[in-house]
Design a protein with these regions (language model features):
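Alpha-helical solenoid repeat scaffolds of the TPR/TPR-like class and their adjacent stem/linker regions
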Residues: 1-513, 518-580
Length: 580
């Protein structure tokens, strides 16, 4: 029985391993592999139960480590902390590994300084552990680019010095040798060379590429590009290296070489991440041929959307009939349009509904529940005077009967919508007439939690907006729904009145100008044809166009302001508001 368990586990057939193990849970080895297989299959509650049973039967440090891992996977962090600290008191052969797990737990829970202390102590005891150094350097990788860069530079300096010491014979590995003959000396020299090569490979393929990316995130673009360029020969088979290099080239407006770098990454690993990064580049360019190629790659986003996608089966069915018959496949059919991405994408791509309404017999549109009332009311208003959406029905729940289903963001692909056609299509949201306010009302929105720790930073501080609006004869109205902030009595807080997107729409009806970050409310404001200033950080999303010349192809009237320096940006924003 155990041989079967071992066989299936080490051949990565965790389902079969779990199935066999669960028939013999009285055997401690079977129980161990049942727990490990459950972890591999992300059946976390089952993994925790088995880990607890293991620890009851055999309270070793190893089983304690397994239990702590199960606690972490089930977000039981306090239990994990308590267990790991208890295990440390044993001071046994797994002392280092328990510390590593504790450091990982500190990282997960945001206690990065505590994690840093553990790694520093471990490195004092074992300064030549390459993987330990890598983990240490990566502590702040997503949270503090300056600290992360400093750690990478510390690592590089240490290992460069180590290499020099080995070359000079000042540092010699312990080598078992009974004689001092020529053959042994030759073998020792060969081992030294292998060690040097190993260190250099570690730096050139694992550490320096990360340093180059950190330089990019800190906007030290020339340094980043120079370092990436110098590392190419060592990373010919490293797909992630080429993906990150492509991002820096793209930001530097070197779009052709960025395209080649993304293609290089794809040639090494045909992963969805590389495909939709390439899609973003192509769609950012704003030319018809690039947009057409980008649409195809953009479909790869659904690889990561299985949990949000209504049905992979129905999407694949739609793709198959489209590949066979093209757009004609949807003529006189009942088509379900579902939404698998954010609110902003739903609003932005909703103008593409007009095209499918021209082709299909009936369109069943199922927006996110928070948007249902808004779209239902808007379609009702529009259908009183227009025919564009007469065959469209807004649904609160997903239907059981339809011919084909497709995501709203896939409409440009399935409906063969050209780039120049997009802005001509009508958004199913009725535009507001310009308000007649004696004192202009300025709406503001500056923060979204979705932008925290994301690849593209979008948020600004409230004070930045207030500085730009200071001493201006306008009434400021906040639409900020989330975040830790305090508004002065001079600012009206309309967020208190908002429960869904229909409320948001209604509360925008008297706004003269909306100042917002890249967010869903930006798209809604633009759909309502409210003069809208979209504030962007230097690295921004593809939908706002080229880095050196931002322009929205979905919203041509958007006033886009890229803020590179906040003091200068506040001055530019102040001037831009006065023109609206």
């Amino acid at each position: 029985m155990l041989n079967q368990v071992y066989y299936y586990y080490f051949n990565s057939n965790y389902e079969k391993c779990l199935e066999i193990s669960e028939k013999h849970l009285d055997n401690i080895d079977a129980l161990t592999y049942a727990m490990l297989s459950s972890l591999k299959l992300s059946i976390n509650d089952k993994a925790l139960y088995y880990a607890q049973q293991l620890f009851i039967k055999n309270a070793t440090s190893f089983d304690g480590l397994l239990l702590s891992k199960a606690y972490i996977f089930n977000s039981k962090f306090q239990e994990a902390f308590a267990l790991l600290k208890k295990l440390l008191t044993k001071n046994d052969s797994l002392y280092k590994e328990i510390n590593l797990e504790l450091a990982l737990l500190f990282q997960i829970t945001g206690k990065l300084e505590e994690a840093e202390k553990i790694f520093q102590n471990l490195l004092k005891k074992d300064p030549y552990d390459l993987n330990l150094w890598k983990s240490y350097a990566e502590i702040y990788f997503k949270k503090d680019y300056n600290k992360a860069l400093k750690a990478h530079e510390e690592l590089c300096a240490f290992w460069s010095q180590t290499n020099e010491k080995i070359k000079q014979g000042l540092l010699v590995e312990k080598i078992q040798s009974n004689t001092s003959n020529f053959q042994d000396r030759l073998q020792n020299k060969r081992k030294e060379n292998i060690t040097i090569i190993k260190i250099e490979e570690f730096l050139n393929t694992r550490i320096l590429p990360q340093k180059a990316y950190l330089l990019f995130k800190l906007f030290k673009i020339e340094q980043s590009l120079t370092l990436f360029y110098s590392l190419q020969e060592f990373n010919q088979h490293n797909a992630q290296f080429w993906q990150n290099y492509a991002k820096v080239l793209e930001f530097n407006s070197n779009y052709q070489n960025a395209y080649h770098a993304y293609q290089k990454a794809l040639s090494l690993h045909s992963h969805a991440t590389y495909k939709f990064d390439l899609a973003y580049l192509l769609m950012r360019m704003g030319t018809e041929d690039n947009f057409e190629e980008g649409k195809k790659f953009y479909e790869s986003r659904l690889f990561y959307a299985h949990n949000e996608t209504f049905s992979v089966y129905h999407y694949n069915k739609t793709m198959q009939i489209f590949n066979k018959n093209g757009i004609d496949a949807f003529k006189n059919k009942e088509i379900l349009i579902f939404c698998e991405q954010g609110f902003g994408d739903t609003i932005m791509y909703s103008r593409c509904l007009e095209k499918i309404c021209q082709i299909a017999q009936k369109v069943l549109f199922a927006p996110q529940s928070a948007m249902y009332e808004m779209f239902k009311n808007q379609i009702k208003f529009l259908n009183q005077s227009e025919k564009n959406f007469r065959n469209l029905k807004v649904l609160k729940t997903l239907p059981k009967k339809f011919d084909y289903a497709m995501p709203i963001c896939s409409l440009p692909f399935f409906m063969d919508i050209k780039l120049t056609e997009i802005s001509q299509l009508k958004t199913p949201i009725k535009a507001y007439k310009k308000p007649q306010n004696k004192i202009k009302k300025i709406g503001i929105f500056w923060f979204t939690p979705n932008a925290i720790d994301s690849e593209t930073t979008r948020n600004f501080e409230l004070n930045f907006l207030l500085d730009a609006l200071k001493d201006m004869p306008y009434k400021i109205i906040s639409f900020q729904m989330q975040g830790d902030y305090t508004l002065s009595d001079k600012i009206e807080n309309r967020a208190k009145k908002i429960k869904n997107w229909n409320d948001t729409l209604n509360n925008l009806n008297d706004i003269d100008c909306m100042i917002t970050i890249d967010s869903a409310i930006a798209h809604l404001s633009l759909a309502l044809e409210i003069p809208t200033i979209v504030l962007l950080k230097p690295i921004f999303d593809w939908r706002w166009g080229k880095f050196e010349q931002p322009k929205s192809f979905f919203w041509p009237k958007a006033k886009i302001l890229v803020i590179k320096d906040e003091k200068d940006g506040a001055t530019k924003l102040n001037k831009l508001i006065k023109t609206i």
